[in-house]
Amino acid sequence: MRSYERSKTAYEEAVKLMPGGVNSPVRAFKSVGMTPIFMARGQGAKIYDIDGNEYIDYVLSWGPLILGHANPQVVEALKRVAEQGTSFGAPTLLENELAKLVIERVPSVEIVRMVNSGTEATMSALRLARGYTKRNKIMKFEGSYHGHGDSLLIKAGSGVATLGLPDSPGVPESVAQHTITVPYNDLDSVRYAFERFGEDIAAVIVEPVAGNMGVVPPVPGFLEGLREVTKQYGALLIFDEVMTGFRVDYHCAQGYYGIEPDLTCLGKVIGGGLPVGAYGGKAEIMELVAPSGPVYQAGTLSGNPLAMTAGYETLRQLTPETYEELGRKAARLADGLHQAAEKYDIPHTINRAGSMIGFFFTNEPVVNYETAKTSDLELFAAYYREMANEGIFLPPSQFEGLFLSTAHSDDDIEYTIAAAERVFARLRG
């Protein structure tokens, strides 16, 4: 058994300083019955806690670190830029460079606005959609988390799913009544909602691969159906690609599935591990954003040199071949975990989209939030604790996916599969 004594001491101090001792709820490790593990450093695919324990990391800061921890090119570029100043409150050439890469690679984006987080991106995109359509209602999907904006914290997933909260106190009913929530992958429910409210629906916001109820890809025809019905009713289609953007494909999920939304929200990978978000789309729509138009959005640190540098240096290293190799590694990991679980009769369903993997402790196919909730949460918690002791760092929630990076070696993956087999044997022992 590993020692977590220093983490326990650090957490005892943290709970006196921050709500729940953390700055984001899922980091509290509540659903897995552990004290939060405090990290000290990372290198490549490995991460090290303050007790000196080493882990193969499949959290990767919740997805952004597609090149692994402390990528040398990113680190060197950040050092160089930091010495010239961290933020100016004025435009820099670095903003242009990252914007050009985003526009070049994301099929639907003609103009992009940089912000500081995925939540900012989705909140801003919704305001823009309402301003463009002059409508009020938004459609989202059960179990999909689009950040902690009031309009979107309705039947959300991720940490909210783990806590069992369908929404949050503090979200006014007057706000919630403008959010329509339907099951993911259910076009009939979408069409029914549009028949009732279609003339007042400004936008449908969707993760093209749901990532906060676990990893749940779209069933064939789902995204195509959303594109069709939104066009029919004059609503905008917003892809929340904060998680999938530059993660599942060189051209993001929209490139992979061949569906172009009206607006796209980005984050995580485009920041290379620093706080960055973005939203973009057709010029006709984006030109409504201030100062070009009347839809207001601003940010003190938006487009700051450090964040732009980390994003640019990350995207610059990614090629179509990168995604082929990541997909190969992820397929091997998913297959190995499946074989290990089968060997010990562990109930499971595995979903994968590119280098994102969802391992659910249920035999039921997971296609939406309701089926994701059939997972055995106690079994997941036991699995999590055992895998941590094996040196595997996983997201401490059944409703989050695993991420791979270019730094993960074949040996890392084979070790992880062998560790899972040992854990499954103990769980069934």
UniProtKB/Swiss-Prot annotation:
Domain of life assignment: Bacteria
One Pfam family of this chain: Aminotran_3
N6-(pyridoxal phosphate)lysine: residues bearing it: K268
Cofactor(s) needed: pyridoxal 5'-phosphate
A single GO molecular function term of this UniProt record: transaminase activity
UniProt-annotated location(s): Cytoplasm
Catalytic activity annotation: (S)-4-amino-5-oxopentanoate = 5-aminolevulinate
Keywords for this protein: Cytoplasm, Isomerase, Porphyrin biosynthesis, Pyridoxal phosphate
One GO process term, biological-process aspect: protoporphyrinogen IX biosynthetic process
Chief localisation class: cytoplasm
Protein's UniProt keywords contain tRNA processing: no
Cytoplasm is among the record's keywords: yes
Pathway: Porphyrin-containing compound metabolism; protoporphyrin-IX biosynthesis; 5-aminolevulinate from L-glutamyl-tRNA(Glu): step 2/2
Enzyme Commission code: 5.4.3.8
Entry GO CC: cytoplasm
Subunit field text: Homodimer.
Family: Belongs to the class-III pyridoxal-phosphate-dependent aminotransferase family. HemL subfamily.
Protein name: Glutamate-1-semialdehyde 2,1-aminomutase 2
Natural source organism: Geobacillus kaustophilus (strain HTA426)
